[in-house]
Amino acid sequence: DRQVGLFFWLWIGQPAATGAYDAGALLEQENGRDILFHQDVPESPDGQQHFWGKPLWGYYDSADEWVIRRQIELLMLAGVDFIVFDTTNARTYPQVYEQVLAVIQAYQQAGWNPPRAAFYTHSHSLDTVRVLYEELYRPGKFASAWYQLDGKPLIIAYTASAPDLAEAAIRGDTAYSPAELSPEILDFFTFKRPQWPFDPFYPDGFPWIEWTYPQPLHGDVMNVTVASHPNV
């Protein structure tokens, strides 16, 4: 029973975008590379995310319901079973994921079979799990839109503080001090371990991107990367 999932970003236009900046358009200019990489100018401000090109539906915001509906429609037509929200940097973007989950439920109520959704955590994983549990899962919001594995909502996260602290230490984050997850939370989810491409191979890992070819099998999960991270 094979299923297909896609990594899904929530942060386009969120939470502090000041405009739409197109790296492809900049590079077409005579001094575009210098503007993009070495200048802090209005057409390419430091600290702002840049589109690599103009998207199909224009320079959109991830919270735009019209765009979300088009995205879910295409995923349904492609036969995608689930999407995995990127909350790997300890931001959960509830103003966006609630819109996506509401659209999924609307399609369900109309008789369609849209992909369900799960979350991927990494930095400050345990704290992010707690936030998601309190924001979404404990109150049972949009429950029919949750992607479930082995009868429980799937979440990609650490289950203990030791690997979470080790990840923070790699980034020089010595102030992070997470409490252990409660038995209630540990029992609520089906957990998969975050698998970063430069980490050792984890048989139970859930990779969001893969740098190895042929792609390794992590238990029952294989990642097929069709477009890699811009820093690679």
Give a label for each model feature.
Residues 1-232:
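Glycan-processing catalytic domains of CAZymes
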